[in-house]
């Protein structure tokens, strides 16, 4: 992915991308006609998967140039958005952008860790916010953690078809047969 080194090419099957999109859309209850914000670069799996989710679920994709302030010119309510922590942090610094963020029903945050200060601010938001766990090789995320509201949790919940275990040297083994060929 490039987050820990030089990015390299990977090959995935379309079916795996469709499966990943369905897992997310089903888990979050996304339906045809819901407005979803694409505000991440298409050269990364996160941006690509937003497009695939919109195609699979029939979402109305609202496309914005990737920036540190994705809510700066949004003038409509959105059902779903995916952002990186820096985008969320920047958005919360500007009152008008924060107000627009609060009009999103569901926000997923991935691509980096969420520090304690940001997580505390997220807990005050009146929308559903999730942190994602995954990587390029799992076609974005395979687990979600609710960050706010009555269902907030300190733990990630893997999608139903995903099995997690530890190897003999205590490294994580991810068995996600719908989205990857390897564990």
PLM region spans:
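Gly/Ser/Thr-rich phosphate-binding loop
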Residues: 93-150
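A short beta-strand/loop micro-motif in the catalytic core of glycosyltransferases
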Residues: 81-82, 107-108, 165
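Conserved ATP-binding loop and adjacent catalytic segment of the adenylate-forming AMP-binding
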Residues: 127-170, 176-182
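Short, well-ordered beta-strand segments
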Residues: 37, 172-173
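Conserved adenylation A10 loop of the ANL superfamily
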Residues: 1-9, 136
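Alpha-helix/helix-capping structural signal
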Residues: 15, 86, 112-113, 178
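AMP-binding/adenylate-forming
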Residues: 11-19, 35-90
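Short helix-loop-beta connector
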Residues: 30-34
């Amino acid at each position: 992915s490039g987050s820990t080194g030089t990015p390299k090419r990977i090959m995935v099957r379309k079916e795996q991308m469709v499966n990943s999109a369905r897992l997310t859309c089903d888990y979050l209850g996304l339906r045809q006609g819901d407005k979803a914000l694409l505000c991440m670069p298409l050269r990364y799996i996160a941006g690509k998967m937003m497009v695939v989710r919109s195609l699979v679920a029939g979402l109305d994709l609202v496309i914005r140039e990737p920036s540190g302030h994705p809510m700066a010119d949004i003038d409509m309510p959105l059902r779903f958005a995916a952002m990186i922590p820096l985008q969320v942090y920047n958005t919360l610094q500007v009152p008008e952008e924060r107000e627009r963020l609060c009009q999103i029903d569901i926000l997923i945050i991935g691509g980096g860790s969420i520090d304690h200060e940001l997580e505390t601010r997220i807990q005050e938001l009146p929308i559903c916010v999730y942190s994602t766990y995954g990587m390029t090789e799992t076609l974005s995320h395979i687990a979600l953690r609710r960050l706010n509201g009555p269902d907030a949790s300190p733990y990630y919940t893997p999608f139903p078809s995903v099995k997690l275990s530890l190897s003999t040297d205590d490294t994580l083994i991810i068995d996600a047969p719908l989205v990857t060929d390897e564990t």
